[in-house]
Amino acid sequence: MTKYRLNDELRSFSYQDNGNKKSVLLRQIIALIDFNDVTAGTPGGWIDDESVLSQSGDCWIYDENALAFSGASITGNARVTQASVVRDGAQIGDAVWIDRAEISHYAQIRDNVTIQNSVIRGECLLRGNARVVGGSEIIAARGLTLENDQLLQIYDRATISNSRVVHQAQIYGDAKINYAFIEHRAEVFDFALVEGNEENNVWICDCAKVYGHARVIAGTDEDAIPTLRYSSQVAEHAVVEGNCVLKHHVLVGGHATLSGGPIQLDDHILVEGHACVIGAVLIENHIEITGQAHIEAFDGDAIHLRGPKVINGEQRITRTPIAGLL
């Protein structure tokens, strides 16, 4: 079945690719038959070759300002709407919806994924019912870590908005990410919530993970930027909020809460149970904080805890202990 033809009119389109100016000649698609919500005679977007848009299925480029070229592939029932650009080997299939977005450089988008007002670039795989919206940027790059072949992936029911996800990061499950910068091999999954704002993004990098029902939330004050680095993890029902930096071998789990700041945890730190850390606190070198333990630095004060130590039960610490008391 031939569902469209190419108009005879040629259109030249110029664009920048990695700093190089390129141009391509495009022809407009014209529907030949009625299918889905498209009627015969309807003009659509512009492509450089018939191989770009499949003659099978209900896939269609709806907007006359939308472009697809340079080895791109649009198949199945995929829809491309508004002024979108699909180029350079990008593969769009199944029931994907691309709306005012740019997809390029071998990105693969499948199943029921929605991309709105965002950029997807590089070798990555988006699948399931994932959503990328709100001016987000997904920039994949392999070969920057020991896992050279790992693809950046976003899948299941994950939602990303107003964020940048780059390199080889993995976002999946029912994770929700808003105003965040996630890079390297970081992972956010399960029902995790990563919530920044217009003032401050959340930063998750290296091999850090956020999962379970954990929440990582930025504040609106200056430097109220939660930062997860190296192998740090926030899990279960834990909450990390504000100016908190988690570094080597840190796990915050249970119903633990970190808030205020500046808080820094480094070198084999475990915070779990219903433990609470508030204010300007530095915790380092093999410390476990569990149970109902409460560590709080009041305004103008700072607490420094250095292990090895175990702080548990209902212990309450409001100042740096004298050596040997803990």
Feature-to-residue mapping (PLM):
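Terminal amphipathic alpha-helical/low-complexity segments used for targeting or macromolecular assembly
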Residues: 1-58, 62-64, 77, 88-89, ...
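Extended, highly charged clamp/arch subdomains and adjacent linkers
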Residues: 84
